[in-house]
């Protein structure tokens, strides 16, 4: 496993907007992803999560904003020049090639560094000379663009501008931002082109064979090298797609709902496998899904996307236990919500009963949403906070899901014990099971 410094930001999206015609699909996206993290973009269909992935991969252009890779804006860099590999939902494997042929495809273009003794001194001198010229040109062009952008921003401050003129100026500013990104990457692009031509060589057949053998062993495909893609199961196709992406040694692997077509058992196995591979190699994985359980199991961090905005970005446990609002809580898991009133420090009123809470950040008298997860509620036949009766009992395999009616409120509870319908029970919970948040009227 690589020694990864996780405090380092590898990808940063800054004030990113994306518009398709008159429709804005992403609105002020700000997202920092640390090197070596497994980050999931989670949201309902049409929320914008796949668009974010495509922007990072270079398959779509931003309307405005920055996509920084190791601190440099790369929004104008084409997909094939980004240090990423993408695994698509349909795998995008070549049906006419074998397992080996699919994996080998990217390696044919791979180049590796020449040994220092293989490079004449004159080449290094030429590189240093050209590098100075490229740096000077880069500085000059960036300075010109900064002056232009300052001028355009000043003009846009005028409140008297009509809509047509404002749009024209904004378009010029957006265009200059793309050109700025291009010149930010100018030195790197020129240097990489020079290095590719003079300081690297093509990978040999022997080296290709070794890399293919190593990656096939890593993803568990040994013995299947010569099989046709049409002969493989969904899980094996997924392993081929993963091997093809990993063998080119990208810094970031982008995964667009790659497990959605698999049946439940294979999908669960592939979830474990993906996480194991990611941790072993220390790569950055950015994963798109609409499956909440999948996101919670796989991720170091989750970005929940709603209507083109990031609703919450945090570690899975933080999002599950401390959602920022009612919508996030409902989306990430089963929920019981109550209207609550904050009485004073560490005291809240729920269903007419004053209870202790660990929360101390609200104002006395403030009306709040109160979340209590079904698995955090305990059932007792003798005593508790509230008395109710069981009106629904569903067996879920490892637990029972009960609906308990307390006066006019239905409360969902998960329990290992069976209770007959109409059974009178009491319910209670620990102090830290109460999660308070500011009220939000929107429903999922």
Curated annotation (Swiss-Prot):
Membrane topology label: Peripheral membrane protein
Name listed for the protein in its UniProt record: Spermidine/putrescine import ATP-binding protein PotA
UniProt KW keywords: ATP-binding, Cell membrane, Membrane, Nucleotide-binding, Translocase, Transport
Intracellular or extracellular location(s): Cell membrane
Annotated source species: Mesomycoplasma hyopneumoniae (strain 232)
Gene: potA
Cited function: Part of the ABC transporter complex PotABCD involved in spermidine/putrescine import. Responsible for energy coupling to the transport system.
Subunit structure: The complex is composed of two ATP-binding proteins (PotA), two transmembrane proteins (PotB and PotC) and a solute-binding protein (PotD).
Reaction catalysis annotation: ATP + H2O + polyamine-[polyamine-binding protein]Side 1 = ADP + phosphate + polyamineSide 2 + [polyamine-binding protein]Side 1
């Amino acid at each position: 496993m690589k020694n990864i410094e996780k405090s380092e930001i590898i990808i940063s999206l800054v004030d990113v907007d994306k518009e398709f015609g008159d429709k804005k699909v992403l609105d002020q996206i700000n997202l920092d992803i640390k090197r070596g993290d497994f980050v999931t973009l989670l949201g309902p269909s049409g929320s914008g999560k796949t668009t974010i992935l495509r922007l990072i991969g270079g398959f779509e252009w931003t309307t405005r904003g920055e996509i920084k890779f190791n601190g440099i804006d790369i929004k104008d860099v084409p997909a094939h020049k980004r240090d990423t590999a993408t695994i698509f939902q349909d795998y995008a494997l070549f049906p006419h090639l074998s397992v080996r042929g699919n994996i080998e495809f990217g390696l044919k273009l791979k180049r590796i560094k020449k040994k220092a003794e293989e490079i004449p001194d004159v080449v290094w001198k030429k590189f240093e000379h050209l590098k100075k010229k490229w740096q000077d040109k880069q500085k000059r062009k960036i300075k010109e663009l900064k002056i232009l952008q300052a001028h355009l921003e000043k003009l846009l401050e005028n409140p008297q501008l009509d809509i047509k003129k404002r749009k024209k100026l904004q378009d010029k500013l957006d265009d200059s931002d793309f050109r700025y990104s291009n010149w930010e990457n100018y030195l790197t692009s020129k240097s990489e082109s020079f290095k590719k031509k003079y300081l690297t060589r093509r990978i040999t057949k022997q080296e290709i064979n070794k890399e293919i053998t190593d990656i096939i062993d890593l993803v568990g495909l040994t013995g299947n090298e010569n099989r046709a893609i049409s002969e493989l199961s969904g899980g094996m196709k997924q392993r081929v797609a993963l091997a093809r992406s990993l063998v080119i040694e990208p810094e970031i692997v982008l995964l667009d709902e790659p497990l959605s077509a698999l049946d439940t058992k294979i999908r669960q196995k592939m979830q474990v496998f993906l996480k194991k591979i990611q941790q072993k190699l220390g790569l950055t994985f950015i994963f798109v899904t609409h499956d909440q359980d999948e996101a919670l199991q796989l991720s170091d961090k989750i970005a929940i996307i709603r209507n083109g905005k990031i609703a919450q970005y945090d570690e899975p446990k933080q999002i599950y236990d401390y959602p920022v609002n009612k919508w996030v809580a409902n989306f990430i898991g089963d929920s019981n919500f109550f209207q609550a009133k904050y009485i004073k420090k560490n005291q809240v009123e729920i269903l007419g009963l004053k209870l202790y809470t660990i929360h101390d950040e609200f104002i006395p008298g403030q009306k709040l949403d109160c979340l209590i997860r079904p698995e955090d509620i305990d059932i007792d036949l003798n005593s508790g906070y509230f008395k109710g009766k069981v009106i629904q009992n569903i067996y879920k395999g490892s637990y029972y899901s009960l609906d308990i009616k307390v006066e006019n409120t239905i409360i969902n509870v998960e329990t290992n014990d069976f209770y007959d319908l109409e059974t009178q029970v009491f319910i209670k919970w620990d102090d830290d099971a109460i999660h308070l948040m500011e009220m939000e009227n929107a429903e999922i």
